[in-house]
Amino acid sequence: MTTQKSKVETLHEEITNLYSVGIQALYEIEGVGHKALQILKSFTMANRKELIEKLPSWSNKDLEFLAFIVHDDFSETYDDKYLLGYIFTLANDSLAANLLDQWLIFFFEENTVESIALLDLMLNRLEGLQSNSYIDATTYQYWIEYLTNLKTKQQGL
């Protein structure tokens, strides 16, 4: 008897299948990550919770591909007020700085993060990026102020 894979396992498998095309192809070829995006869009709340629980064990490469799928520049995006920010907190310094530079600003223009805990994690991640010289003082200050203001709004202060 074979056990059926969870949707999270299916998504992870699809992401690892994308390794063969490479991350650059995701940037250049429309629709390459479409199947993975459709799997993600079919998630129930339970699937999403499982994904959040399993993401810390995913490789940085997995996180990079997932971040691209969440924010596909060519077509549709995955409307989530948490996932891209959470990936930012888990990624290594290089990927986190890249996410900050390329995608998070657009993410925040379109979404409001409602999790104060996530905003705290993101603020801590910024500290690490700045102390490891992955972002300059101006970028650091901008994001600290932005996230602090967002956090204040969420707290209703």
Regions found by a protein language model. Give the residues of each.
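N-terminal "cap/leader" segments of large eukaryotic alpha-helical scaffolds
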Residues: 1-35
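Amphipathic alpha-helical scaffolding segments comprising HEAT/armadillo-like alpha-solenoid repeats
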Residues: 2-13, 42-54, 77-89, 113-123
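Eukaryotic acidic, Ser/Thr-rich intrinsically disordered low-complexity regions
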Residues: 2-5, 119-157
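Alpha-solenoid helical repeat architecture
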Residues: 19-27, 40, 54-59, 88-94, ...
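Structural detector for internal amphipathic alpha-helices that build alpha-solenoid repeat scaffolds
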Residues: 27-42, 56, 64-76, 98-113, ...
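Structural detector for tandem alpha-solenoid helical repeats, activating at a conserved register
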Residues: 46, 61, 95-98
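Residues at alpha-helix boundaries and short interhelical turns
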Residues: 74-77, 94, 130, 134
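A mid-sequence interfacial segment
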Residues: 87-127
